[in-house]
């Protein structure tokens, strides 16, 4: 914030692709939202892992908590989570996580039709592919240019399971 960020991305204790990070408790999330908004900064909550049916009540709770704390939006991988967020907290922006593997014009347009206002496209794309997508969508686009150096396709990683016995698709990248 002190360096002038216009947005902050955070994870809660569950369903973040950075499961082993020191993610935010409900109280910490509320305080972070207040501080960000006091400074004119948006705060987005990452719910960017795959979900299973038995986790739906917990996902619903996370969505409600994010909305009640004042988050501006959610970064989502699972389309079921997107639908839940649309019903539970329609005021929240929905951003399609890079974990969704949206690497084509048709994929980005489908996300747009589902109500995503921003799409984080794959870091594997060439400049020409990025340009083609940007010329054919009204959704905001985001792309990682620094950070994780995945050797697989974003959102389709099984290397962590093979080498580390952990799932990168569930927030436990090895």
Question: What is each model feature region?
Answer:
Residues 115-116:
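As written
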Residues 1-102, 121, 129-174:
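Active-site pocket-lining/capping segments in soluble small-molecule metabolic enzymes
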Residues 104-106:
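Conserved nucleotide-cofactor-binding alpha/beta core module
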């Amino acid at each position: 914030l002190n360096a002038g960020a216009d947005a902050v991305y955070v994870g809660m204790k569950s369903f973040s692709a950075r499961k082993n990070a020191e993610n935010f408790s409900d109280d910490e999330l509320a305080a972070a939202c207040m501080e960000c908004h006091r400074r004119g900064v948006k705060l987005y909550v990452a719910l960017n892992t795959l979900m299973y049916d038995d986790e739906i009540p917990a996902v619903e709770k996370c969505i409600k908590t994010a909305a009640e704390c004042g988050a501006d939006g959610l970064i989502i991988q699972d389309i079921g989570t997107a639908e839940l967020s649309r019903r539970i907290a329609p005021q929240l922006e929905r951003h399609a996580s890079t974990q969704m593997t949206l690497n084509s014009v048709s994929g980005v347009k489908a996300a747009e039709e589902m109500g995503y206002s921003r799409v984080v496209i794959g870091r594997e794309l060439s400049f020409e592919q990025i340009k083609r997508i940007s010329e054919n969508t009204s959704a905001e686009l985001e792309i990682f240019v620094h950070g994780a150096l995945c050797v697989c396709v974003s959102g389709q990683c099984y290397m962590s399971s093979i080498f580390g016995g952990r799932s990168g698709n569930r927030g436990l990248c090895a």
